[in-house]
Amino acid sequence: MKIFHDFSHRAFIFCYISTMKKVFYLKTCDTCLKILKKFNLKDWELREIKINPITEEEVEQMHKLAGSYEAFFSKKSNQIKLRELDPKKLTEEDYKELILDHYTFLKRPVFMTDNEIFIGNDKKNLEALRSYFAD
């Protein structure tokens, strides 16, 4: 947290700038829980997405950071088979709508700050997370 002082007035004005730090996960996902245990998440908001669904604003923030909706769409969701979806035929708008419609369409876990996003459990992402937390 940073504190800025504005000396142009007689009184001090304190402005607090907080950094958004959120983790989106599923408590029934052993992989998510294993990854969460590896990091100090004291200052992070932990969001269990089944209980507290992702909002459209959060999906838009993810899109801005990731560059596409497909980047954080889980092609392993059981809903794909249940809904008889063909992921190859889905559009960016389809990905967005599906992620908002059902929590299992979000690739997990997602670590998101104001400027960075870490999506999923692949090796490259986990290395990037380790580097982020090491700084």
Predicted segment positions?
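Local sequence-structure signature of Cys/Sec-based thiol-disulfide redox active-site neighborhoods
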Residues: 20-41, 46-49
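Thiol/selenol-based redox catalytic cores and closely related redox-interacting motifs
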Residues: 52-129, 133-135
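Cationic, amphipathic, low-complexity segments that mediate targeting or membrane/lipid association
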Residues: 1-9
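Short, positively charged and aromatic/hydrophobic N-terminal segments
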Residues: 13-17
